[in-house]
Amino acid sequence: MSEKEKKELTQECEELKEKYKELEEYAKRLKAEYENYREEVAREKRELIKNANEYLISKLIPVLDDFERALNQGEKGDAFYEGVKMIYKKLLNVLEKEGLTKIHVGEKFDPFEHEAVERVETEDVEEYTVLEVVESGYKFHGKVLKPAKVKVAVKPRKKEAEKVEEPSDKKE
């Protein structure tokens, strides 16, 4: 083999090595893009399912409220009452497994989780303390779907004696 042929083969070999490196880099980029695409599609799918679940669960909240009203009116120990209670607990359990949580009413009123439906003037407890839950509130994966309707304590208004202002300078 001549010197010229060796140079040509060496040059061709170098070009092929360069081409191989380019193709290898291209393949790595494609693989990374594909992985990112798969992750994005999976995230979008999870988000779509979550939004669909949120929509359905928000439509079921009035049903939960109706169950609670029925249970508050029923007589404990009655077979019908116990059956309704069992169905309510099963429904609530299924919804909780999907991400629904009842808003637990703490001691203080929180305008992001509570809706004040009544203000009760009292000095017995600290101001803005939740006194009673009128209707339960719910969250879905941390997002408030329905605020809890509550009665809130407020300080009594001071009834000031009516002041009769007498004009100091009467013009006649």
UniProtKB/Swiss-Prot annotation:
The molecular function GO annotations come to: adenyl-nucleotide exchange factor activity; protein homodimerization activity; protein-folding chaperone binding; unfolded protein binding
Cellular localization per UniProt: Cytoplasm
Q: Which GO terms describe its biological process?
A: protein folding
Q: Which InterPro entries match?
A: GrpE (IPR000740), GrpE_coiled_coil (IPR013805), GrpE_head (IPR009012)
Which Gene Ontology cellular component annotation is one that this UniProt entry carries? Answer: cytoplasm
Q: Which Pfam families match?
A: GrpE (PF01025)
* Keyword Cytoplasm part of the UniProt annotation: yes
Its quaternary organisation is: Homodimer.
State what this protein does: Participates actively in the response to hyperosmotic and heat shock by preventing the aggregation of stress-denatured proteins, in association with DnaK and GrpE. It is the nucleotide exchange factor for DnaK and may function as a thermosensor. Unfolded proteins bind initially to DnaJ; upon interaction with the DnaJ-bound protein, DnaK hydrolyzes its bound ATP, resulting in the formation of a stable complex. GrpE releases ADP from DnaK; ATP binding to DnaK triggers the release of the substrate protein, thus completing the reaction cycle.
- Protein name, per record: Protein GrpE
Q: Which organism is it from?
A: Thermotoga sp. (strain RQ2)
* Taxonomic lineage: Bacteria, Thermotogati, Thermotogota, Thermotogae, Thermotogales
